Amino acid sequence: MASLDVSSLLGMLSGDGVSALGKSADAKKSQVSSVLDSALPLLLTGMKNNASTKAGASSLNKALKDHAKDDTSDIGSFLQNVDLSDGGKILTHILGDSKEREAASIAERSGISSDQVMTILSAVAPLLLSKLGSSKAEDEEEDDDGAGLGDLLGSLLSGSE
């Protein structure tokens, strides 16, 4: 399994990534970090829940394939140029009706507005799909043992507990 967990995702976003997110959301780095600490496990859990049904897994697999080839070599640049509208749609697929409630909860804990949280999450969602998609593609190339999407998401979440 390719080495990817919540800690490594947070690490990738440190520095330029947090700065880019802070600029786009008009938030301090500490606030962005607080949002990410809460949001990444939430997004991964949402994806895992979606992947628990055949239709959800199929939809998520398609999204991962669509985003796997995104160029994320410069995360700061990726986040500055990300399509926030696409990110918002991704969030709706991942979180469904709870999107606004979750954003409000994260906003309260992070000391920023729900709109700022939504901007950050809308930027991070395509990056998350890209990283998961490329990790899944690597796993399929390395070892075609039938490990599913739920296994990948579960391994990511186990690193956050």
Where are these regions (language model features)?
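A structural "flexibility-hinge" signal
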Residues: M1-E161
